[in-house]
Design a protein with these regions (language model features):
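Acidic-basic catalytic patches of nuclease active cores, encompassing PD-(D/E)XK
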Residues: 16-57
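Bacterial N-terminal signal peptides that target proteins for export
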Residues: 1-6
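Conserved catalytic cores of phosphodiester-cleaving nucleases, focusing on short active-site segments
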Residues: 54-65, 79
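Nucleic-acid nuclease catalytic cores
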Residues: 65-70, 80-125
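Short, surface-exposed coil-to-beta transition loops
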Residues: 71-75
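Bacterial N-terminal signal peptides
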Residues: 7-16
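Active-site phosphate/pyrophosphate- and oxyanion-stabilizing loops and adjacent acidic/basic residues
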Residues: 32, 77, 106
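Short, flexible loop segments at the rims of nucleotide/cofactor-binding pockets, characterized by
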Residues: 39-41, 64-67
């Protein structure tokens, strides 16, 4: 009985987590749009084996959903360091509520005088 209950609980948690992670489009959709717009190459393998979402002539850009802004800061700086290019973040805003994340990342970058350029894609536009 306990085994069945635990299995049901795990299944319910898994389904709930996957429903909460639902996105309007996958990250790759926005990467492709931005790569075309900025003449960049997608999924470029770095010397350390990680992959930068978009590399342009001047920037190494991390593309991420707005609620992952904190991870985007670190990743963009890592890619920038490895390629000796400017760091960039492209935040995907799926609703007007995501604007708060854009404001937060811009404020932190300004406060700490980080050299990261921030762009946003508003999925509803």
């Amino acid at each position: 009985m306990i085994k069945v209950t635990l299995t049901a609980l795990l299944l319910a948690l898994t389904l709930t987590a996957s429903l909460g992670a639902a996105r309007l489009n996958p990250e790759a959709h926005y990467q492709e749009i931005a790569a075309k717009k900025y003449s960049g190459q997608t999924e470029v393998t770095m010397p350390d084996g990680t992959r930068c979402d978009i590399v342009t002539e001047t920037h190494a850009i991390e593309v991420d959903f707005a609620d992952k802004w904190a991870e985007a800061i670190g990743q963009s700086l890592n890619y920038s360091f490895q390629l000796n290019k400017k760091a960039g973040i492209l935040l995907i805003l799926e609703s007007i509520k995501d604007e708060k994340h854009l404001i937060r990342v811009q404020s932190i970058i300004k406060h700490f005088k980080l050299t990261i350029d921030v762009l946003a894609i508003r999925a509803w536009e």
